[in-house]
Regions:
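Acidic Gly/Asp/Thr-rich repetitive segments characteristic of extracellular carbohydrate-active
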Residues: 3-37
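Short, solvent-exposed loop/turn elements at domain surfaces
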Residues: 13-15, 56-59
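Extracellular beta-strand-rich solenoid/capping regions of secreted or surface-exposed proteins
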Residues: 23-24, 35-50, 57-81, 86-104, ...
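Acidic, glycine- and Ser/Thr-rich low-complexity intrinsically disordered tracts
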Residues: 26-29, 44-48, 57-58, 65, ...
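Right-handed parallel beta-helix
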Residues: 50-56, 76-87, 104-114, 126-141, ...
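Extracellular beta-strand/beta-solenoid scaffold signature
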Residues: 61-71, 91-99, 114-123, 142-153, ...
Length: 273
């Protein structure tokens, strides 16, 4: 496996060139700096992408790989560490910092700011997403659709740990359709200037464990409930929401419920624990 280093003083100066050069098992190191319009599609089966010497900032600057995102990920096993994604927008309203379409993706110590979606995930039931120690903030404004800071599709497993979400707009801070969700020790708080709907939503139920988080709705919320479970239907064989050791705060004007569980739309054996 090779190591490819990207930077203004390196042999490879453009991220898109690194995406074409990289092979399965390679590591791509991106030096700190601002990279404007450096969009890319990554299809290698196994790949490590890491910022070095500080956190590189990828600014969409009106560009989108495949008219989808700053980066499109379609590998079997990919890790992304220490990268910042900013300003993703497309005409359809689904512009993402990362569009994750196949395989298993691990995101660590990354920042997503001013995107229509921070990460947008496809619907394949063998996919897995893990996010740790990352920041999602300042959802894009003025787009044709609600902007979710994180939108997880119908995948096998979603893990979220040690991360921060703030300042949504129109959409939700965290929305997941995954079969299994493990959400621990995060700060999910809309805060000043935020106009999110739900802070945490599981529209199709699933097996969700939510432990040790601070989840807070702001005064300009678009929805009175903080957490929503099963608003559309129950898609998965296990529909169970486990809440433990969380701090829930509702500063919304309507003082709505901390949790709304849509039992009329879920199977009879759905449980809240």
């Amino acid at each position: 496996a090779a190591v490819i280093t990207v930077g203004p003083n390196e042999t490879v100066t453009r991220i898109a060139d690194a995406a074409r050069l990289a092979r399965d098992g390679d590591t791509v190191l991106i030096r700190a700096g601002t990279y404007r319009g450096e969009v890319a599609v990554w299809t290698q089966k196994s790949l490590t992408l890491r910022g070095i010497g500080g956190r590189p900032v990828l600014v969409a600057a009106g560009q989108a790989a495949e008219n989808k995102a700053i980066w499109v990920i379609r590998g079997e096993q990919v890790s992304i560490d220490n990268i910042e994604f900013r300003g993703a927008r497309v005409a359809a309203g689904h512009g993402a910092g990362i569009r994750f379409e196949r395989g298993r993706l691990a995101v660590r110590d990354c920042v997503f700011e001013d995107n229509e979606h921070g990460i947008l995930v496809a619907n394949f039931e063998d996919m897995e997403l893990s996010i740790r120690d990352s920041i999602f903030r300042q959802a894009a404004r003025g787009g044709p659709l609600p902007a979710h800071l994180l939108y997880v599709g119908r995948i096998a497993r979603f893990t979220l740990e040690g991360s921060r979400f703030e300042q949504g707009h129109g959409g939700h801070l965290v929305k997941s359709r995954a079969r299994v969700n493990d959400i621990r020790y995060n700060l999910i708080a809309d805060g000043a200037g935020g106009e999110a709907s739900y802070e945490l939503e599981f529209p199709e139920g699933g097996d969700a464990t939510v432990v040790g988080n601070v989840i807070a709705q702001g005064p300009a919320t678009g929805n009175p409930a903080v957490i929503s479970y099963g608003a559309e239907h129950g898609r998965w064989p296990v529909n169970r929401l486990r809440l433990a050791h969380n701090t829930l705060i509702n500063d919304g004007p309507a003082q709505g419920p901390f949790l709304r569980a849509w039992f009329d739309r879920l199977p009879a054996d759905a449980r809240i624990i």
